[in-house]
């Protein structure tokens, strides 16, 4: 983590992190596509127990890395919902 002294430096670091996040989300999307092709039925796309399992794992990681749960949980729930929509589209 870089100690920033100006808003320009802060913005540069946020932009760098955003680029990394996009790269990771693109990688995640590839696995969502694979899941859409592997699952045998459309009803298998939404798996509520799995959703809750993922959210719990994320919240554990959020705690470990001092990421606010108020940010982590809604962001991941939205990510999961959008991933499900995408998975339905490629199913």
Segments predicted by a language model, with ranges:
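Domain-level signature for soluble enzymes in the chorismate/prephenate branch of the shikimate pathway
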Residues: 1-91
């Amino acid at each position: 983590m870089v100690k920033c002294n100006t808003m320009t430096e802060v913005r540069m670091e946020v932009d760098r992190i955003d680029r990394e996040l996009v790269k990771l989300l693109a990688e995640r999307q590839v696995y969502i596509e694979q899941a859409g092709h592997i699952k045998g039925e459309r009803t298998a796309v939404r798996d509520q127990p799995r959703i809750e399992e993922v959210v719990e794992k994320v919240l554990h990681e959020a705690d470990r890395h001092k990421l606010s749960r108020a940010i982590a949980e809604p962001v991941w729930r939205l990510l999961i919902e959008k991933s499900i929509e995408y998975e339905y589209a490629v199913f």
